[in-house]
Every structure is written in C-alpha cells, then in structure tokens.
A protein has these predicted regions:
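Conserved Class I S-adenosyl-L-methionine
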Residues: 178-264
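Class I SAM-dependent methyltransferase SAM/SAH-binding core
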Residues: 35-37, 42-82
Length: 264
C-alpha cells in the first residue's frame, strides 16, 4: 500500500465535501448512526465530515501513527485487513480513497463487513483516476497531464481507476448496493495559496514525474519517451511559473468519485 504525507492528503482532498454538498452520502444514513468507523482515515478529513453528519461516536483508523496524530478525532492504529474491533460493532463502516491503494480491496471489504452490525452500512468513496480532467491557462498542460495520467494508471501496482465498486460489494455479500457519483474540483486561481505556488514550482522541475518515473515506465513508456515527457513538462511548468508571476495562471482539475454503499 502506498504511504502518504499529511501535506499530500490536505492538498489532494482540499474542497472535498465543502459547502455542505453531501447528497452523495445520503445512502450512508449517517443521521441515524450511533457508531461510525472511517478506515484509512489518514489525517482525518473524511472523518470530520462523518462526524458532522452523524450524532454518534466516530472513530478513525489508520496504520500510520503520524497521520493519526494529525487527525482531530478518536483514532485507532489499525490495518484495513485486520481491524482491531469485535464483530458487529459499527452502524457504518466507510473509507475514502483507500481501496484504490490496496492490492486486494476485497480482503479489506470483508473486514468492513465483519465489524459492521447486521443491517449496518458499508461505504467506499473511491476515485476513477483515469477519468480526471484538467483545464489550464497553459496550453500544453491538459494534454501533458493526460499523457502522464494514462501512463500512471497503466503502471500503478493497484487499480487507481477503481471508481464504483458495485461488483466488489456484491462479491462480499452486501445487499441493496447503490452507487452515486460525486465530483471534487480543485481550482488554482489568484490570489494564489502558498501551496499552489509551491505546486507550480514543482512543475517547472518536473518533480512529480521524477518521483513517479518507475511507475510511468511500468505503464509502457520508454526511457526516451520519459525524457521527452519530462522536457515538455518542465517547459510547461516554466510557463505556469511565468503566469503565476503576472497573476494570469488558472487551473481546474475535476476528479470523479463514486460513493458505493451496501447493507450488511
């Protein structure tokens, strides 16, 4: 399973469920849940949403102690494949962007089912990273982002384009399965946040491509193709830096998430 930093989680989950737009979570029936578990909670962004929507006890579980320490919630150090809770404990067991990072998501779901009470709900909020779209004031950015994304999806060790997981829910015996789509929008525009300025500076260095080079190679790119992609990415990044300097850079990224809910 990939490991993430607190800053990465804060950046990638910025704006998720903001503004009270939480209709996609309706099937979790959080208003009637007394005990809720967020598995793979990280630094607690989704846990906080669950706590806002539920009147009951909300617990976050993650195997990374540093992320748990940053989460403003009741936290338990735990592996998603071996949750330290008795059978039939929770009314709702949920996760966000966890199954896409697991080599065997069905194994984790079976644990979710075990610790959920009969009649309780299991939910997974998972992205389809293959369907992410980018709009940018830098002309080359959208096409380059798509090229890098295609290679990343093809080369990743897990199914990062998992999205809706109805088949997995059916396979572990969950009933009344529903799937709702929710879109997360990440916007960069003036006045720029410090994190956005740093992210643009990373583009000019092609830092993300360097860190993911092995995965991109696994996706089918040759060394020459990766070198050319890096060259074009740095050129795009320098133009983005220039636009930030004059206050004209704008970027909009839309990530489709699918909220799959089933009943135990």
């Amino acid at each position: 399973m990939r490991r993430f930093t607190e800053s990465y989680l804060a950046r990638t989950r910025e704006g998720m469920w903001a503004g009270g737009e939480r209709e996609a979570l309706a099937d979790l029936e959080l208003a009637s849940a007394d005990r809720v578990l967020d598995v793979g909670c990280g630094s607690g962004e989704f846990t906080a949403v669950l706590a806002e929507e539920s009147p009951g006890r909300v617990v976050g579980a993650d195997r990374d102690p540093d992320l748990l320490a940053a989460a403003d919630c009741e936290g338990v150090r735990a592996d998603a494949h071996a949750l330290p809770f008795p059978d039939d404990t929770f009314d709702v067991v949920a996760c966000q962007a966890l199954l896409v990072n697991l080599p065997d998501p069905a194994r984790a779901l079976r644990e979710f089912v075990r610790v959920a009470r009969p009649g309780g709900r299991v939910a997974a909020v998972e992205p389809d990273n293959a369907a992410v779209s980018v709009e940018s004031s830098v002309g080359a950015e959208a096409a380059l982002a798509q090229r890098a994304r295609d290679l990343y999806v093809a080369g990743a060790a897990t199914d990062v384009a998992l999205g809706g997981v109805r088949d997995l829910f059916d396979a572990v015996g969950l009933a009344d399965v529903t799937v709702r789509r929710y879109e997360q929008t990440l916007t960069v525009e003036p006045p720029y946040a410090e994190e956005d300025v740093r992210a643009v500076a990373r583009k000019a260095k092609a830092a993300d491509l360097r860190e993911r080079r092995g995965v991109l190679a696994n996706g089918g790119a040759s060394e020459a193709e990766l070198d050319e992609l890096r060259r074009a990415w740095r050129e795009m990044g320098r133009e983005a830096v220039r636009q930030v300097g004059e206050g004209s850079y704008r970027r909009r990224e839309t990530v489709p998430f699918y909220v799959t809910v089933g009943r135990v």
